[in-house]
């Protein structure tokens, strides 16, 4: 899944915008704008700012309670890659179908570019039926692509084995101090794009001495260094930011490249026990 380059002439930081090939034949913008913890009232302006800077992928979720604001921020931009997620309480075939319609209503859209199952919730054991609903929603044109979030190897293999349909992507916690190498390797084998939530490690990575040193070497913001590391590993990070300064600092990841030595130094920060968020094997929401 090599990154491809597409020209996007938007914003003050106009640049080549890389994309990743999805297994359904579509292209995914490689750097996204996350909206976790952005209030409904603040979402329109934050999203408008991100689009003005140049982002072409916007991520939200039903549980974020800001889909209406995100939809307003996207406005009439028909070519923005918009994705949302179905929350845990909506799992199950019929509940998922209804929840997806509600997401579309809040977003003001008749479809989304990507629809994700937010968590597997293995104790509920409804994610296979939810995935079957996703397949039907894609067939109805309500989701152009379908994927999952926080799925483990056993979860991925089960939905593939039971439905024959492989998710286009799996959005997981991933940052320099929690690199999920085994799961990434599985994604490569299965043709699944790895999308990354909390790609900056909730800000901890920005304060890391190695990251700070590379930021000084490159003359780029520390956040951009981390996001560039993600991108050179063919990952799709979706950092959240609310101020224009931070949004632009993150977007600077498209303006430079890291050397092999710099990449290796960041690779060395990995900690298999460095998870910040919930363990998908235990989390039921």
Predicted regions and their residues:
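Alpha-helical scaffolding within the catalytic cores
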Residues: 15-20, 68, 99-102, 154-157, ...
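N-terminal binding-site loop/beta-alpha segment at the start of enzyme catalytic domains
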Residues: 2-80, 133, 201, 282-283
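Beta/alpha (TIM)-barrel catalytic core signal, keyed to glycine-rich beta->alpha loops juxtaposed to Asp/Glu
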Residues: 88, 120-285
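CE4/NodB-like, metal-dependent polysaccharide N-deacetylase domain
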Residues: 96-117, 136-140, 161-162
């Amino acid at each position: 899944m090599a990154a491809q380059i597409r020209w996007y002439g938007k914003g003050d930081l106009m640049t080549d915008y890389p994309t990743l090939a999805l297994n359904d034949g579509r292209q995914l913008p490689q750097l996204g704008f996350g909206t976790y913890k952005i209030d409904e009232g603040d979402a329109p302006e934050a999203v408008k700012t991100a689009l003005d800077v140049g982002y072409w992928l916007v991520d939200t979720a039903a549980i974020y309670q800001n889909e209406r604001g995100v939809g307003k921020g996207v406005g009439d931009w028909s070519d923005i890659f918009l994705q949302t997620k179905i929350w845990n309480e909506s799992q199950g075939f019929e509940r998922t179908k209804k929840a997806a319609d509600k997401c579309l209503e809040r977003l003001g859209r008749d479809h989304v570019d990507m629809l994700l199952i937010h968590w597997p919730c293995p104790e509920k054991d409804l994610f296979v039926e939810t995935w079957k609903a996703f397949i039907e929603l894609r067939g109805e044109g309500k989701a152009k692509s379908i994927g999952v979030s926080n799925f483990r190897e056993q979860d991925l293999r089960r939905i593939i084995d039971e439905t024959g349909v492989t998710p286009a992507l799996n959005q997981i916690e991933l940052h320099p101090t929690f690199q999920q190498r085994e799961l990434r390797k599985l994604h490569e084998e299965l043709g699944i794009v790895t999308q990354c939530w909390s790609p900056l490690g909730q800000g901890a990575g920005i304060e890391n001495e190695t990251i700070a040193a590379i930021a000084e070497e490159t003359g780029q913001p520390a956040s951009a260094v981390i996001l560039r590391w993600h991108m050179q590993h063919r990952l799709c990070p979706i950092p959240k930011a609310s101020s224009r300064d931070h949004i632009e600092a993150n977007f600077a990841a498209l303006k430079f490249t890291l050397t092999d030595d710099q990449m290796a130094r960041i690779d060395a920060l990995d900690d298999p026990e460095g998870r910040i968020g919930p363990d998908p094997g235990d989390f039921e929401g």
